Amino acid sequence: MEWWTAFQAFILGVVEGLTEFLPISSTGHQIIVADLIGFGGERAKAFNIIIQLAAILAVVWEFRGKIFQVVRDLPSQRQAQRFTANLLIAFFPAVVLGVLFADLIHEWLFNPITVALALVVGGVVMLWAERRKHVIHAEHVDDMTWKDALKIGCAQCLAMVPGTSRSGATIIGGLLFGLSRKAATEFSFFLAMPTMVGAAVYSGYKYRDLFRPEDLPVFAVGFVTSFVFAMVAVRALLKFIGNHSYAAFAWYRIAFGLLILATWQFHLIDWSTAGEM
């Protein structure tokens, strides 16, 4: 493995790890950075699956205590049963719409204008959600009802539109539906586990012919890097929201959306590769 290839894998692993669970759209960042460092082609599809899987495994590791507790208590404890049911309920809408419309959305909406508009609109909605008067009825994830879970699951479906951000959609949805920042953020992380693992398994099977033994070192660099930086991002976000709102992320989304429009308008980024990400 050449040093430049290793460097590319490292950089993209950092980008994936830092942006996957922040409400700022990891897809848009990956497209721009991949173009800047010249990383593309069929290997990029397989590589993206690997680093996304690493990011979600970082969340699994970070919340391993809660996961173990739920699994242990599932046969007998009502709270664990309700939490699991809420995850399944929230996961279901994305499964249905993903099966029905994923390819169609990827074909028609994966373009710089859609990504940029989704970022800007999402940023504006996030600002509004933060500034409106909060009536919190679920301080912790264990306080959520099945109706909360279903509404957040429907909100997650908006993330099928490129640039929306899965974490952004679920966190904003949680805030609008009466969850505290902590509960909305943590449930977003938990919901990411089945959602992203399912997406990775589906994509891995779809592109199974692209996984080659000679690419293993590149995948390993990206995997480890994404795992480490995803863990850093998750811990930092949980600490950040304890004393701050999501306004900073909202303004960043708006600025980033305008940047994407500029890169497209002035042909600074090869957005023809967007559909490959």
Curated annotation (Swiss-Prot):
Compartments reported by the entry: Cell inner membrane
Spans traversing the lipid bilayer: 47-67, 85-105, 108-128, 183-203, 218-238, 249-269
GO CC annotations on file: plasma membrane
One Pfam family linked to the record: BacA
Membrane topology designation: Multi-pass membrane protein
Catalytic activity: di-trans,octa-cis-undecaprenyl diphosphate + H2O = di-trans,octa-cis-undecaprenyl phosphate + phosphate + H(+)
GO MF annotations in UniProt: undecaprenyl-diphosphatase activity
Listed InterPro entries: UppP
Domain of life: Bacteria
Keywords from the named record: Antibiotic resistance, Cell inner membrane, Cell membrane, Cell shape, Cell wall biogenesis/degradation, Hydrolase, Membrane, Peptidoglycan synthesis, Transmembrane, Transmembrane helix
Principal localisation: membrane
Entry EC number(s): 3.6.1.27
Biological processes, Gene Ontology terms: cell wall organization; peptidoglycan biosynthetic process; regulation of cell shape; response to antibiotic
Family that this chain belongs to: Belongs to the UppP family.
Role this protein plays: Catalyzes the dephosphorylation of undecaprenyl diphosphate (UPP). Confers resistance to bacitracin.
Miscellaneous remark of the record: Bacitracin is thought to be involved in the inhibition of peptidoglycan synthesis by sequestering undecaprenyl diphosphate, thereby reducing the pool of lipid carrier available.
PANTHER family (alphabetical): UNDECAPRENYL-DIPHOSPHATASE (PTHR30622:SF3)
NCBIfam families with a match to the protein in the record: PRK00281.1-2, PRK00281.1-4, undec_PP_bacA
UniProt-recorded name of the protein: Undecaprenyl-diphosphatase
